[in-house]
Swiss-Prot record:
It comes from the Bacteria. Pfam families: LUD_dom. InterPro entries: FTHF_cligase-like_sf, LUD_dom, LutC, NagB/RpiA_transferase-like. GO terms for biological process: lactate metabolic process. This is Lactate utilization protein C. Belongs to the LutC/YkgG family. Is involved in L-lactate degradation and allows cells to grow with lactate as the sole carbon source. PANTHER family: LACTATE UTILIZATION PROTEIN C. HAMAP family: LutC (MF_02104).
Length: 229
C-alpha cells in the first residue's frame, strides 16, 4: 500500500494555497492518440519478429527457443561469451521453466536479500547476470524488470554480460502498454519499489557520436524468447 500519500498531497495543496481537488478531475481526452495505434493488432509472433529486428539495431543477441530447450540456450550463450561465473535472480520462474538444476551449479549464485551486500559483491565479479523480463517492449527492444525480494537490480547491471529470459506472454507493442500495466499495479497498491527499462547493452556516445559500449553496464546482452509453460 502507498503510505503517507494523503499527508503529502495535503501539504502540497496547502503550499499552493488551495484545498485538494479529489472530485471532478477528468483524464484529458486527446483528439489524436497515435501511441495506441502502433502495432495495436500485432500478434505475439509478429511482436517477436519486431523484437528480433530491433535487437539488431541495439546490438543485442537474440534467440528464440521452446521451453524444453531453454537450459541448452543458456549454456550456449554463456559459452559464446566465454563466461565462467553466473549470478541470477532468486525467481520462481527459473523452476517453472525447468531450470532448477541450473541454479544448483557451483558456478551459479543467487541474489539473496538477507545479505544484499554480499550479493552485490558477487554481481560485481560475475561474468553473466540472468533475469526474467516482466514486460517486454517489442518496438524498442526493451525488457522491464520489477525489483522485489530476490530480484536485485545489480544482477542486470554489474556483470560483464547480461541475459534476459523473455516469456513470450510478456511481449507488448511498446511503452504505451507497459505504462498501462504499471498504472494498474499502482491503483492496486502493488507498484514495485524499482522498475528498470533496459534496451540492450550499455551504450554511450560523446559529442562526436563515437559509440562506447559497456561504460554504464554490461558489454553484451542476449534476449532469449521462450514459449510459456
Amino acid at each position: 500500500m502507498i503510505k503517507n500519500r494523503d499527508s503529502f498531497l495535503d501539504h502540497v495543496a496547502n503550499q499552493l494555497g488551495r484545498p485538494r481537488q479529489t472530485e471532478g478531475v477528468l483524464r484529458p481526452n486527446y483528439r489524436v492518440s497515435p501511441q495506441f495505434e502502433v502495432l495495436k493488432d500485432a500478434s505475439k509472433d509478429e511482436l517477436v519478429t519486431v523484437l528480433k529486428e530491433q535487437c539488431v539495431a541495439i546490438h543485442t543477441d537474440f534467440k528464440q527457443v521452446e521451453s524444453g530447450q531453454l537450459e541448452t540456450a543458456l549454456d550456449e550463450t554463456i559459452d559464446m561469451y566465454g563466461a565462467k561465473s553466473v549470478i541470477a535472480w532468486d525467481d520462481r520462474r527459473f523452476h517453472e521453466f525447468g531450470l532448477g538444476s541450473f541454479l544448483t551449479r557451483p558456478s551459479v549464485s543467487l541474489w539473496d536479500n538477507r545479505d544484499s551486500k554480499r550479493s552485490i559483491e558477487q554481481a560485481e565479479i560475475a561474468d553473466v547476470g540472468i533475469t526474467f523480463s516482466d514486460i517486454t517492449l517489442a518496438e524498442s527492444g526493451t525488457v522491464t524488470l520489477f525489483s522485489s525480494n530476490g530480484k536485485g537490480r545489480s544482477v542486470s547491471l554489474l556483470p560483464r554480460y547480461y541475459i534476459a529470459i523473455i516469456p513470450k506472454s510478456t511481449l507488448v507493442a511498446r511503452m504505451t502498454q507497459a505504462a498501462r500495466h504499471i498504472r494498474q499495479l499502482t491503483g492496486e497498491g502493488r507498484l514495485p519499489s524499482c522498475i528498470n527499462f533496459i534496451s540492450g547493452p550499455s551504450n554511450s556516445a560523446d559529442i562526436e557520436m563515437s559509440l562506447v559500449v559497456g561504460v554504464h553496464g554490461p558489454l553484451k546482452a542476449c534476449y532469449i524468447v521462450v514459449d510459456d509453460k
